[in-house]
Amino acid sequence: MPFTPAEDELTEALIDLKSRDPQLGIAKVHALLLRNYPDWSVSEKRTRKILQYHGLIVSSSSSPAATANEPPVFPSSRVMDQLDVKQWSDKVQVKFFNKKKGKGLVAVTNIEEGDTIWKEEPFIVAPEWEIYDMQRNSTACGYCTTPLALDSPLINVCPASSSTMPAASTSTNPCPTRFCSRLCLARSAKVHPILCPVQNPASAPLLKFARDSQWMALHALIHTTARILLVNQHGIETLRKDWDIVQSLAELGMEERFKYSFKSSAAPEPDRAVWKKAFTLYLQAFKEPKTPPEQKKFAKLLKKPLPAEVEHGLFDYDAGFLRGLGRMSLNLEAHGGLYVLHSHLNHSCDPNVSVRHLDQRNALSRITVLAKRAIKQGEELTITYVNPKLGYAARQHELRSWGFGSCVCARCIEEEKMARQAPSGNGGGDAGEVADMDDLAAELKAGLGVM
């Protein structure tokens, strides 16, 4: 006897069918659905509603190469005119492709398989939580994230903890942060002072909130904002350089991300209350500390006001905070670092580049970019944003969760053809993988702060 499927179950089935043949119209998708699920009772009106809700309607104006399951809004980015790529590598250059794809990196010479294309230190690093906890427990470097040899004579403690300055009444505990060398201690001055619980105790509740909610995008925005605030104390030129880097990153606001990437019948609205709570703590940490002792310490760190445009870009709720969160989530490397040149790399399900953390004894946060295969002059360098072991439909599903639309790399085009040619009864593998993505999607939403 036919029964009415649950909304989530029906949505997954329709996404899978559209992934197999994106050009199918509503009537054909509906007919295919009923053929594949003969015990379901679903009206064409309900099918249409779900397809429209998820942006899966074929537009009559679409080109043959376009796919119907691409979101109507894509991340935007801009090219940095003053970026000196040669400080990292003489093998690549930045190229702007088009408004939809944005910028990327192309080879300026032939690159052999296994070649090191460049090494890069992070602009900021908001490490994955396991390493962050090690930093808080004084067992990993507070700058480069390398695990500490606790008996090493090279270890340096936070200056605020080793000085004779009186502790604030709001905190009698020393800063737990340690550094593996004097070099890391010196470099940490770009970010650490304003996140130090002794020097700026107002930052502690914000960092705790990010940790408790395991919100990596917020954690990265915290470090980025700290860097901008501190670099402003050194002059307008250094501020402009760093601010230009931040503004050039690919971005998609939190509201847009949720509307076009995460929205579902099960979670029709984002948890805006959490966003507002985070924003309140963000302002208290970086602009308006709550108590007079906190305000006094904060004033010692930041004596120069920000230019109006930078202040707006950091502290306006929509144009600053929410868009900043979107930038972080789109550009973070897997382990929590934000890297200037690395952020230019686009996605392919058949990437020609891999990113490794090879300096694990003395610079864990440094990345090394290696050629997975030979790359010809003029060819774009790509990495994968998703697990390449997933099937076609599951990879497309995950990319949509990031707001990137459909991948049209050579591998995806070939696998889509194979899926379309396969008998309908033999195509359940990817559908299962798409279903398996629900747990990952939930984890992703939590990390980006939309749950």
Where are these regions (language model features)?
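Short alpha-helical interaction motifs and adjacent low-complexity tails used for partner binding
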Residues: 1-451
